[in-house]
């Protein structure tokens, strides 16, 4: 290069080359660029060579990534792996024995409090399951999401990285036969049993995830921030926790204010959104806080390093390195609170309730500066043994959240009752713990193993097995014929079948066609289901069912099956009218639930306030835009982008909109299964513009200006969004008419069978 002028472009190329060929320089630069304050959000500075998503440049672009996550290609076991079969091959007694042995084998790199990892594992289990929330069914123990960001780096999960590492020998031994998500829950059960508690049961069957869930955990951009309540103090839907990075509530009190009654309000909200009533809430808190201690030996900001997600590569996924004292044992720091609740932290007792109700409590601070409480009675200030230093004793402690259970009148009544009746208390905690750790597993058929308790709980949405259909091919043909002669239109049958099946959500495997709860309260009265039409169609189908069952002997048809069959017959009729012969796959065997088997309050949380597939949107109750809610619903139905696309187009052609609205019905042949929606949406002779009605668009003839169609944003997004348009074009091809019908039927059948 000597004697030549080096321009800026050449210089830049040289610098890039140096980075490529000098790993030390490249790593140093990468490290510098990745370093940011603990818990900080992105600063806006672009990381070198990092591609940017379209949402980076255009934040309002619809994000379709929820429909592409958890791809089977991410699973190292492959699509054909049968986890249920693998789990059932385990010797569960031996697995539990291995965990039990591990509990008291204290490791030098992370010594056990009181010589027992039991309380530590209980916290791990609780925090894994406790992310579950009822409003959208997301969170929970399933998938083992505690292993991944952001949960593995939440402040409330500090040190739980070590708990999972302690369990690694057990996981390594049993491999694919024992998922992390099952192991994390089982470890909590074994810990309880080790410390003298009789658990209610355990069910395996949780499949592991291989990547983080895309979940909205709150609006905040900093950990421990709280900006999720409206002016009336109501927690934003669908959230359950009060702060970013916490499982439930701030233990020091609302936004750090030591107000027990205010804390009680937050606790009631948070636990109710986790499907727990007051009795279950108190049992869980009291039972959980019977064991172990809190850790706040020093101020976190002075001692703790970065959380796992921000720690250096050499940390190998561990975080919160503690540079103070030993870095563990009596120098351990997690929440910043310090101390144990009871005098026997590794035994099942009623001491938590006794301490809470017996003593008056005075406010103090932990060594880390966190607000907590100790008894005013100094005689018990040396009652609690130190977790690591022999001969050292402390006072029992309570948090503001604990005192909420004493000062809230309703919680106190329950606490006093439990203290007076230890067996009632034990059973209440056992059942609440079982519910906590199994709430996101769906119906009882998903529960595996010898320790599954007999019977069904109401929260498992039971269905009467005796009502399951046992139909022959001839029976199905006979029923289809009766349905076709009933006078029910294609649209009516399609709407009812969709309403029944589309209540399903994969997040906690609730809802769906099985059980025919579309005929029961509260589902039959949901606005989205058009109650008047639903009642009419159900009445007709009930008559067909009664007539068939009268002479069918043991081959009875359930209402659940008949609803799905009515939808299938409607599709076959609509396809035939469009010129296609289709046999819609139908597999009987669904049963019917009773009203007594249906918790109305619990099922009310499944109500759809937006269903883009029916072009329904309730602006007063939806927390996202119509198009975002469409993607959210498609995600809950486990749909891919093409499946979502073909279903919307087909349902519009079938005239299946809410209350028969014509928005997006871009066809002159409504009620037939055709691809007109895509053909007409992409037709350049149509000019789309906003109408005078908010959320409604008008399609005008580009030449004459005459109105042709109306549509919503959910319809137009398939022509506007580049990714969706690419798929829509496929279904608009002249050569894709058969493909459209086949793909629609396949996606429809998938939705009908999601809960099976």
UniProtKB/Swiss-Prot annotation:
GO terms for cellular component: cytosol. It comes from the Bacteria. PROSITE patterns: PEROXIDASE_1, PEROXIDASE_2, PEROXIDASE_4. GO terms for biological process: cellular response to hydrogen peroxide; hydrogen peroxide catabolic process. SUPFAM superfamilies: Heme-dependent peroxidases (SSF48113). Binds 1 heme b (iron(II)-protoporphyrin IX) group per dimer. Its cofactor is heme b. There is a cross-link at residues 126-248 (Tryptophyl-tyrosyl-methioninium (Trp-Tyr) (with M-274)). The record marks 123 as: Transition state stabilizer. Keywords: Heme, Hydrogen peroxide, Iron, Metal-binding, Oxidoreductase, Peroxidase, Signal. The keyword DNA damage does not apply. Heme b binds at residue 289. There is a cross-link at residues 248-274 (Tryptophyl-tyrosyl-methioninium (Tyr-Met) (with W-126)). Pfam families: peroxidase (PF00141). InterPro entries: Catalase_peroxidase (IPR000763), Haem_peroxidase (IPR002016), Haem_peroxidase_sf (IPR010255), Peroxidases_AS (IPR019794), Peroxidases_heam-ligand_BS (IPR019793). GO terms for molecular function: catalase activity; heme binding; metal ion binding. It catalyses: H2O2 + AH2 = A + 2 H2O; 2 H2O2 = O2 + 2 H2O. Its EC number is 1.11.1.21. Residues 1-26 form the signal peptide. The keyword Heme applies. Coiled coil: none annotated. The active site is at residue 127. Belongs to the peroxidase family. Peroxidase/catalase subfamily. Bifunctional enzyme with both catalase and broad-spectrum peroxidase activity. Homodimer or homotetramer. This is Catalase-peroxidase. It comes from Shewanella loihica (strain ATCC BAA-1088 / PV-4). The gene is katG.
């Amino acid at each position: 290069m000597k004697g030549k002028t080096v321009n800026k472009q050449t210089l830049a190329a040289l610098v890039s080359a140096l980075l490529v060929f000098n790993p030390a320089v490249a790593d140093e630069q990468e490290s510098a660029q990745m370093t940011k304050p603990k818990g900080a959000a992105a600063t806006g500075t672009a990381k070198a060579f990092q591609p940017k998503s379209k949402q980076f440049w255009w934040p309002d672009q619809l994000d379709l990534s929820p429909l592409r996550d958890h791809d089977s290609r991410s699973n190292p076991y492959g699509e054909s792996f049968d986890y249920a079969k693998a789990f059932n091959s385990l010797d569960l007694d031996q697995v539990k024995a291995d965990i039990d042995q591990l509990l008291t084998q204290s490791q030098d790199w992370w010594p056990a409090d009181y010589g027992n990892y039991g309380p530590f594992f209980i916290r791990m289990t609780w925090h894994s399951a406790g992310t579950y929330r009822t409003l959208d069914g997301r969170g929970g123990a399933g998938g083992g999401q505690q292993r991944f960001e952001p949960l593995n780096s939440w402040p409330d999960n500090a040190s739980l990285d070590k708990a999972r590492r302690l369990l690694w020998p057990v996981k390594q031994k049993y491999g694919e036969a024992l998922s992390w998500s099952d192991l994390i829950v089982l470890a909590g059960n074994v810990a309880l049993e080790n410390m003298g508690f009789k658990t209610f049961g355990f069910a395996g069957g949780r499949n592991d995830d291989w990547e983080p869930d895309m979940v909205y955990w709150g609006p905040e951009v900093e950990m421990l921030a709280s900006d999720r309540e409206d002016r009336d103090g109501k927690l934003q839907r669908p959230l359950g926790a009060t702060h970013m990075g916490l499982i439930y509530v701030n233990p020091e009190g609302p936004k750090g204010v030591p107000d027990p009654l205010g804390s009680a309000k937050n606790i009631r909200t948070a636990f109710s959104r986790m499907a727990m009533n007051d009795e279950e809430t108190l049992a869980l808190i009291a039972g959980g806080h019977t064991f172990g201690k809190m850790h706040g030996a020093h101020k976190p900001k002075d001692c703790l390093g970065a959380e796992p997600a921000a720690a250096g590569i050499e940390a190998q996924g561990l975080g919160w390195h503690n540079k103070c004292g030993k870095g563990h044992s009596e120098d351990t720091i997690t929440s910043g609170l310090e101390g144990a609740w009871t005098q026997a932290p590794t035994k099942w007792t009623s001491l938590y309730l006794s301490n809470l109700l017996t003593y008056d409590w005075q406010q103090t601070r932990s060594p880390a500066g966190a607000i907590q409480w100790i008894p005013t009675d100094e005689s018990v200030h040396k009652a609690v043994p130190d977790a690591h230093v022999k001969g050292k004793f402390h006072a029992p402690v309570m948090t503001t959240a604990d005192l909420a259970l004493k000062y809230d009148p309703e919680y106190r009544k329950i606490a006093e009752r439990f203290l007076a009746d230890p067996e009632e208390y034990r059973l209440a905690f056992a059942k609440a713990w079982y519910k906590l750790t199994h709430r996101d597993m769906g119906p009882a058929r998903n529960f595996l193993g010898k320790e599954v308790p007999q019977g069904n709980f109401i929260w498992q949405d039971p269905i009467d097995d005796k009502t399951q259909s046992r139909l022959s091919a001839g029976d199905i043909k006979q029923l289809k014929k009766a349905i076709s002669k009933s006078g029910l239109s294609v649209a009516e049958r399609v709407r009812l079948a969709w309403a029944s099946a589309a209540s399903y959500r994969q997040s906690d495997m609730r809802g769906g066609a099985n059980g025919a709860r579309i005929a029961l309260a509260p589902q039959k009265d949901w606005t989205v289901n058009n109650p008047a039409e639903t009642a009419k169609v159900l009445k007709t189908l009930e008559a067909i069912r009664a007539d068939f069952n009268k002479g069918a002997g043991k081959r009875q048809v359930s209402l659940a099956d008949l609803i799905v069959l009515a939808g299938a017959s409607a599709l076959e009729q609509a396809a035939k009218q469009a010129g296609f012969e289709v046999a819609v796959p139908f597999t009987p065997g669904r049963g019917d639930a009773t009203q007594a088997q249906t918790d109305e309050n619990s099922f009310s949380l499944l109500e759809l306030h937006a269903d883009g597939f029916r072009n329904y949107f309730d602006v007063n109750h939806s927390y996202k835009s119509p198009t975002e809610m469409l993607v959210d619903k498609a995600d809950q139905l486990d749909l891919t982008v093409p499946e979502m696309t073909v279903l919307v187009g087909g349902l519009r052609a079938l005239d299946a909109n809410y209350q028969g609205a014509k928005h997006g019905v871009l066809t002159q042949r409504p009620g037939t299964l055709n691809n007109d929606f895509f053909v007409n949406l992409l037709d350049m002779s149509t000019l789309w513009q906003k109408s005078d009605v908010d959320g409604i668009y008008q399609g005008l003839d580009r030449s004459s200006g005459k109105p042709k169609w109306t549509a919503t944003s959910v319809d137009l997004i398939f022509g506007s969004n580049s990714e969706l348009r690419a798929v829509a074009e496929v279904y608009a091809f002249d050569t894709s008419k058969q493909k459209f019908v086949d793909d629609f039927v396949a996606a429809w059948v998938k939705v009908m069978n999601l809960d099976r």
